[in-house]
Amino acid sequence: GGCVSCHTAKDGETFAGGRPIKTPFGTFYSPNITPDRETGIGGWSDKDFAKAMREGVRPDGAHYFPAFPYTTYTRMSHADALAIKSYLFSLPSAAQVNRDHDVRFPFSWRVVQAGWKLLFFDAGELAPDPAKSEEWNRGAYLVEALAHCGECHTPRNSFGALDRTMWLAGTI
């Protein structure tokens, strides 16, 4: 779990990316999230990092593909997003160039992601349920935001969005 499971290729440097993520739309390759200023996220500001995590937008303004779980990370607090950045920036840098995705047309166009977001992205921090206990709300926050459990354990629709009617129903 956590960042390392997607952002570390087999036999690769930790957090240096390159792990293939096969989808019906093609293969995505995880990026380098080490603090390397040239090939990783070392040049990112707090605003850049929070916008990537919570809005699915790169520092250059391009939209991320939803293979990156920003659709779930949007539910985390701004403070937790910056705590993750602080941790990642404390790790060793790896000068590993990011590999281009191998995604079929028209899904390869990042601009298409803007339309996808209009249909399937509900931005915003998870609000606690006042009818539930503090412990329950903390668990919900861990499952629905930080641990992003639904990203692997919820089936997706034909457009690659989580099928919320099947929340945590499994994908195998």
Segment roles from a protein language model:
Residues S45-P59, T72-N98:
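C-terminal capping alpha-helices of c-type cytochrome domains
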Residues G1, G115-E144:
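Electrostatic cytochrome c docking/interface patches
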Residues F89-L126:
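Small beta-barrel nucleic-acid-binding modules, principally OB-folds
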Residues S5, T14, E38-I41, P59-D60, ...:
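Short loop/beta submotifs within extracellular cysteine-rich repeat domains
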Residues G2-K10, F49, I84, G139-L142, ...:
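The canonical Cys-X-X-Cys-His
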